[in-house]
A protein has these predicted regions:
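Acidic-and-aromatic substrate-binding clefts and catalytic sites of carbohydrate-active enzymes
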Residues: 42-44
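A beta-strand edge to alpha-helix "cap/lid" segment located at domain peripheries
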Residues: 2-3, 37-39, 48-123
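Short, low-complexity N-terminal intrinsically disordered segments enriched in polar/charged residues
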Residues: 1-24, 28, 32, 73, ...
Length: 123
């Protein structure tokens, strides 16, 4: 996926793998004790993440990473996503690493828009 120790490249690799529906690469990037939190669920473990949160990326029309900031074992990534139906949103995710594996991701949702209008983001 990425050179060992380059956390920004590891994050880019995870996003590229997600967009390619490459679940095996994403699973390999996550630590065994991985935890995932969003406003809809807290401390979801790795098996539950793939059972309940993983979905085919065919709904995505365009996805752009806007910025990645790395500070030691922690990183933030902000991205803009446009769905094939025209809905768009910006999210920020907080990553924690254990070596070169991601041990935690906390997702912070931004607003969603469609046709220039603010819409409530569905789960």
């Amino acid at each position: 996926m990425a050179a060992a120790g380059n956390r920004a490249e590891i994050i880019r690799g995870i996003f590229a793998a997600y967009l390619a529906n490459d679940r095996a690469s994403v699973e390999a990037a996550f630590a065994e004790d991985f935890r995932f939190s969003t406003p809809y669920g807290e401390n979801i473990d790795k098996p539950r993440y793939f059972a309940e949160c993983w979905r085919d990326s065919g709904w995505i029309g365009r996805h752009e990473i806007e910025r990645i900031m790395v500070d030691g074992v922690e990183a933030y990534v902000t991205y803009h996503c446009v769905a094939r139906d025209g809905k768009s949103f910006r999210n920020t995710e907080f990553f924690v690493f254990d070596g070169d594996k991601v041990s935690r991701i906390d997702v912070y949702f931004g607003p969603s828009h469609q046709d220039g209008e603010l819409v409530r983001q569905d789960r």
